[in-house]
Amino acid sequence: MLSLGFIALGAAVSIAVIVWALLYREYKKIKLQEKIKHIRQRIREREEDSGNESDGDAEWLDGDEEWLVTLLSSSKLDQGNWV
């Protein structure tokens, strides 16, 4: 009887891990979409202010350059699963 309880506990833990992994994947997709939306907004703002180029945008991209390169690389776009 005790072994049946351990099996049930193991199954419950396994199901919980799978559910949390799926939820985390969806969370990451949502965060990526929000980041893309934010970048699009920044691009629109820059288009409106195209006469005044500043170095502020370079500072804004410092932490995101690697992320943008990964996001916009052709291999990621071809896979179709980046968002």
UniProtKB/Swiss-Prot annotation:
Keywords assigned: AIDS, Apoptosis, Host membrane, Host-virus interaction, Inhibition of host innate immune response by virus, Inhibition of host tetherin by virus, Ion channel, Ion transport, Membrane, Phosphoprotein, Transmembrane, Transmembrane helix, Transport, Viral immunoevasion
Q: Could you state what the record's PTM comment says about this protein? A: Phosphorylated by host CK2. This phosphorylation is necessary for interaction with human BTRC and degradation of CD4.
Q: Which residues lie on this side of the membrane: Cytoplasmic?
A: 26-83
Q: Which gene encodes it?
A: vpu
For this protein, the record's SUPFAM superfamilies field holds: HIV-1 VPU cytoplasmic domain
What does the entry note on its domains?
Answer: The N-terminus and transmembrane domains are required for self-oligomerization and proper virion budding, whereas the cytoplasmic domain is required for CD4 degradation. The cytoplasmic domain is composed of 2 amphipathic alpha helix that form a U-shape.
This protein's name: Protein Vpu
Q: What ranges does the Extracellular topological domain annotation cover?
A: 1-4
Q: Is Repressor a UniProt keyword of this protein?
A: no
Miscellaneous comment in the UniProt entry for this protein: HIV-1 lineages are divided in three main groups, M (for Major), O (for Outlier), and N (for New, or Non-M, Non-O). The vast majority of strains found worldwide belong to the group M. Group O seems to be endemic to and largely confined to Cameroon and neighboring countries in West Central Africa, where these viruses represent a small minority of HIV-1 strains. The group N is represented by a limited number of isolates from Cameroonian persons. The group M is further subdivided in 9 clades or subtypes (A to D, F to H, J and K).
Q: Which InterPro entries match?
A: Vpu, Vpu_cyt_dom_sf
Q: How does it assemble?
A: Homopentamer. Interacts with host CD4 and BRTC; these interactions induce proteasomal degradation of CD4. Interacts with host BST2; this interaction leads to the degradation of host BST2. Interacts with host FBXW11. Interacts with host AP1M1; this interaction plays a role in the mistrafficking and subsequent degradation of host BST2. Interacts with host RANBP2; this interaction allows Vpu to down-regulate host BLM sumoylation.
Please report a single Pfam family linked to this protein: Vpu
Check the record and name the HAMAP family matching this protein: HIV_VPU
For the modification Phosphoserine, the affected residues are 50, 54
